[in-house]
Regions:
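Perimembrane helix-loop-helix junctions
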Residues: 152-182
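Transmembrane alpha-helices and membrane-interface helical segments
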Residues: 23-31, 106-113, 155-163, 234-239, ...
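Loop-to-helix entry region of an early transmembrane alpha helix in multi-pass inner-membrane enzymes
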Residues: 5-26, 48-52, 56, 94-98
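Transmembrane-helix motifs of polytopic, lipid-linked glycan transferases
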Residues: 15-45, 60, 106
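Membrane-interface alpha helices of multi-pass inner-membrane proteins
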Residues: 130-146, 152, 157
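Transmembrane helical bundles and short interhelical boundary loops of multi-pass, membrane-embedded
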Residues: 183-189, 194-342
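Short hydrophobic alpha-helices at membrane interfaces in multi-pass membrane enzymes
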Residues: 113-139
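Membrane-interface micro-motifs in multi-pass membrane enzymes
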Residues: 50-115, 221-226, 277-287
Length: 342
């Protein structure tokens, strides 16, 4: 038994992943408290302890949700595997994904917080500390695993360019100042991806364009796969769609998901890396932040639920979340029993 325990490099990687994943839970708890804590305390007078317990429970539980899947032996149409082709917010088998997550969470929230502010006059001076923190968080996430960064940069770039054209370049300098925060990350991305664009072993290199070709090798029913992966966020969106206009963080969470889906569906690495489907890692970050945004909205809606109808709708949404959580706990238990991830 002793010989089967991880030692040396493996043990160090396992401990680092555990500590960083724990840090991600703490980071998410802090962000939930910051953005919905006050509203929950207002909605729960006389129970000062309850909002903190609620956000803490939600923060920890989110790291155990997974895709929804049927019991063993039952197969859904077009779904070949439990994980492959469907994907999950928590790929427990990938240490670098988990290691990058605390920095990804902090970078996501910091950028979402800056979005309503960066176009103000002298925002880069007034919020200079936030600009620096965002740049550092994004760089650290990139150094651990660049998959999240590619998605965030894509979504943020389109959003900032659209705002700049819409304002007829009146916000040109504020856009440049916020763009400077991305420069350290761009340098690291160029270093990490230099091998992708260099042909190896006589094979073509670079990034190719497709329409789901790689994804369809693992799953032939993409609509169902999407529903199994983000069923809970989709339900919250359908019942709270007006929050997209009111809540910039919630809106940005869906922009992140949308960009991650487009990249996974339309892009692939040429050559021997094609079937590795490395753009799926960015998609899994998109799934994770779709859950984060949905939980922010649901926590807020739960606190405001003052009628039987609103309480019933909140309960339905929590049951959908519980479904993902039960599947995730069973999926995690399978890992502990030696089951394969796919």
């Amino acid at each position: 038994v002793t010989g089967s325990l991880p030692t040396g490099t493996e043990l160090a990687m396992a401990l680092a992943a555990m500590l960083l994943n724990s840090a991600a839970m703490i980071a998410l708890k802090i962000m939930l408290d910051r953005h919905v804590g006050a509203e929950l305390r207002k909605a729960m007078p006389g129970k000062a302890w309850l909002p903190g317990v609620l956000t803490g429970t939600v923060a920890v539980s989110l790291f155990f949700v997974s895709m929804v899947y049927p019991p063993t032996g039952i197969y859904l149409p077009g779904i070949k595997y439990k994980y492959l082709g469907v994907f999950t917010a928590n790929p427990f088998h990938n240490a670098t994904y988990m290691a990058a997550r605390p920095f990804a969470i902090l970078a996501f929230f910091k950028y979402a917080e800056l979005m309503p502010l960066y176009e103000q006059d002298n925002a880069h001076k007034e919020y200079g500390r936030d600009y620096i923190l965002f740049s550092v968080y994004l760089l650290l996430a990139t150094m651990a695993k660049p998959s999240f960064t590619i998605v965030l940069v894509g979504a943020a770039g389109i959003l900032m360019l659209w705002r700049m054209f819409h304002s007829k370049f009146r916000n040109f300098m504020p856009t440049i100042w916020l763009g400077v925060c991305f420069l350290p990350t761009f340098a690291d991305l160029l270093y990490q991806f230099r091998g992708v664009f260099v042909p190896q072993e006589g094979q073509e290199g670079g990034i190719g364009f497709t329409l789901g070709h790689v994804w369809l090798q693992y799953c032939s029913n993409l609509p169902l796969a999407i529903g199994l992966a983000v069923g809970f966020p989709i339900l919250v969106l359908l019942l709270n769609y007006k929050e997209l206009c009111r809540d910039s963080i919630y809106r940005f969470s869906w922009q992140i998901y949308g960009m991650s889906f487009l990249m996974a569906f339309c892009l692939y690495e040429k050559g021997f890396r094609e079937m590795d489907f490395n753009f799926s890692w960015g998609y899994m970050y998109g799934i994770f932040f779709a859950f984060v945004g949905a939980l922010l909205v649901l926590l807020r809606a739960t606190g405001k639920a003052d009628t039987k109808k609103k309480k019933g709708l909140a309960a339905i949404q929590w049951l959908a979340y519980l479904w993902h959580l039960v599947c995730g706990l069973y999926y995690f238990w399978g890992f502990l029993q030696g089951a394969m991830y796919y």
